[in-house]
């Protein structure tokens, strides 16, 4: 494609979806290889990198439905990978914490996951990775704003 070629939005959407599909297969495969489901992994990863949190805090970070998150927390607690404790000052609020076993499992799984993604993205140099991140973030924020506006207008 020449520098002057026009790239239309539907064509770009197809490229984005194909890329997303290919990278998702790699990411999900690396997670499954660790014996975790995707929901369990993202909950453990959030606790690993952000520390103890409530279910609601994790949900908002990883964009999971309430039912999925509750089921994941129950599974992870049964496996001894996390524990629930009461929040200081409000015993009704439950805070999730990694156990030692949970930390070992998620550190190993995350290491494998990160290595697989690094390998998949090794075709990009550091500058291209920074540019891609900035462009995708810009597009995502704009699209989220457009979607919110359309939902408010009753047209979407």
Where do the protein language model's features map onto the residues?
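Short, locally clustered residues in the helix-turn-helix/winged-helix DNA-binding domain
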Residues: 17, 45-49, 110, 137
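Short alpha-helical elements of helix-turn-helix
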Residues: 10-14, 34-45, 67
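Residues within helix-turn-helix
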Residues: 55-56, 67, 74, 94
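C-terminal regulatory/oligomerization modules of transcriptional regulators
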Residues: 1-6, 126-156
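Charged, amphipathic alpha-helical coiled-coil/dimerization segments
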Residues: 24, 74-137, 141
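N-terminal leader segment of winged-helix/HTH proteins
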Residues: 1-34, 155-156
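Short capping segments at the starts of secondary-structure elements
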Residues: 50-54
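The alpha-helix within a helix-turn-helix
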Residues: 59
